Amino acid sequence: MKRVVAIPGWFLLALSIFVSGGWGALALYYSGPQTPVLQAALAGTFAIAALLTLTALGFRRRRWRALAAYLVLFAVLLTWWLGIEPSNDRDWQPDVAKLAYATVDGDMITVHNIRNFAYRSETDYTPAWYDKTYDLSKLEGVDLVAVYWMGPAIAHTLVSFAFAGGDHLAISIETRKEKGEAYSTLKGFFRPYELSYVVADERDVLRLRTNYRKDPPEDVYIYRSQGSIESGRRLFLEYVRQMNALKTKPDFYNTLVNNCTTDVWYNSLVNATHLNFSWKILASGYVPEYLYESGRLDTSLPFPELQRRAHVNTRAQAADTAPDFSRRIREPAANSTQQKPSPKDN
């Protein structure tokens, strides 16, 4: 009986070494010294140490000494990794070179560094930012925007706040990449990217996705949320609080727990009527469906029809640089003859 009990214990120990060894190797590879050769060498060395420890478990006289050495090595690695600090002082890509922030004077919120690039292609653009004051008492609604490029399960989500007079302010939570740095989902688990609140004109952040991103192409859907205006105001102020905090205290992006969709949900916790956490928040492409099932979108239409009407690519391409871009992409699509497939068909 003791041997039967012991086998699962050794199995769990071996599994822990295997998992921690893989994690440690990846952490060194993605977040280690900036020299790629040194990153690879350190990652390989740690992986070999984990494999040698696993091998030593089969030898009674060596296992405890090897295990103790591995635990010390892993503790050193973990201490180093936890000590990595985010920074606002790097050589940033132009699209995230400026951090947005806001000043609050009662209901009057002045947002600084609103991005509004003039695009000629995804990578060819003229940078431009502006400041604008919004009257929070004139907030009219909050839209969820879902952007798909790889099937139904994964989407980039952002919010756009609608104000009287046709003003819209979009806020997209993204990685803040350095020049020459590319995004990697796996890399995003290991603290290589800072977090950024990209506050933008819809002619920038939406038109970039509908009109210029081609490899792969992206499909954009806009849904009007059904929450109260007061909840929308609290949500806007929470976004302001978070973007201001990042300006003075940077934070890391994380692929799983600190990303474009989880942070939208975290920010929504400011309202008592927030949705409970769901696996559909992690599988972000299903967030619109989750909101629909929870009564937070227009339920007078079947969801497939609501989704069809929410697709804005054709209207955005037609509107292009028009001053009333935000109004035109939201024009009713009920009579449209276009049969845009759902993200499930992408």
Summary of predicted features, one role per range:
Residues 190-270, 276:
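Soluble catalytic domains of enzymes that build or remodel membrane lipids, polysaccharides, and related
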Residues 62-86:
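Internal/C-terminal transmembrane anchor helices
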Residues 104-108, 162-166, 227-232:
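A short, structured loop/turn motif at beta-sheet edges
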Residues 109, 114, 120-217:
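Glycine-rich catalytic cores of cysteine/serine-nucleophile enzymes that process amide/ester linkages
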Residues 2-53, 241-346:
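Activation targets extended, charge/polar-rich intrinsically disordered C-terminal tails
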Residues 86-105:
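Alpha-helical transmembrane signal-anchor/signal-peptide segments
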Residues 44-71:
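Cytosolic-side transmembrane helix boundary signature
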Residues 62, 69-71, 94-98, 114-130:
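Juxtamembrane/interfacial segments around transmembrane helices
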